[in-house]
């Protein structure tokens, strides 16, 4: 089934909202079920704040501070505008027409334990005269653990390989 560009944008935006809701629910369940240090603290719940972008679009920041997670941000945005002449030379499909549209999600989670690395993930759908998905993920350890790093990267690559034909950097 072919979707028009307008339908693709609508579907992508709705998918990111749904993904945000699923991710926030999963983090809140972990907070509710947690039974370790800081268990006397109240479980974290997400608070949401809407924002608008000058030039078009906006998003919603979802922030949680909890007893397992020191702080988690799950942010979605849908923005549009025109790339500068210089920048449009660097972006696929923007050389012919510098207008863009983008929708995406970003997740950053910091745990209380220094033994658990912070994690970041983002993915986005971008439309110029062409359209594509992009994104990535990483761990930021406070205490280096090569086993964690290798497990993370192999699991991430294995998942991507199941669904996508990508070059992994």
Task: Give residue spans per PLM region.
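Gly/Pro-rich turn-and-neighbor structural signature
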Residues: 2-92
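Short, well-ordered alpha-helical packing segments
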Residues: 13, 20, 24, 106, ...
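Short, surface-exposed, charged/polar-biased interaction segments
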Residues: 29, 33-37, 97, 126-130, ...
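Internal mixed beta-strand/loop scaffold within catalytic domains of large alpha/beta enzymes
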Residues: 58-135
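N-terminal accessory/precursor segments of enzymes
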Residues: 114-162
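Conserved small/polar residues in nucleotide/adenosyl-binding loops
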Residues: 167-169
């Amino acid at each position: 089934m072919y979707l028009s560009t307008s339908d693709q944008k609508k579907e992508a935006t709705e998918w990111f909202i749904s993904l945000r809701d699923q991710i926030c629910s999963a983090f809140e369940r972990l907070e509710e079920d947690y039974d370790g240090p800081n268990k006397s603290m109240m479980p974290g719940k997400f608070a949401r704040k809407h924002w608008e972008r000058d030039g078009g679009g906006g998003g919603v920041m979802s922030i949680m501070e909890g007893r397992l997670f020191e702080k988690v941000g799950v942010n979605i945005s849908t923005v549009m505008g025109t790339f500068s002449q210089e920048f449009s030379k660097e972006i696929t499909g923007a050389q012919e027409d510098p207008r863009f549209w983008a929708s995406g999600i970003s997740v950053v989670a910091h745990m209380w334990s220094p033994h658990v690395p912070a994690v970041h993930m983002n993915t986005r759908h971008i439309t110029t005269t062409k359209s594509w998905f992009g994104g990535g993920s990483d761990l930021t350890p406070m205490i280096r653990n090569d086993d964690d790093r290798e497990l993370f990267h192999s699991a991430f690559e294995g998942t991507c390989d199941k669904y996508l034909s990508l070059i992994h950097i």
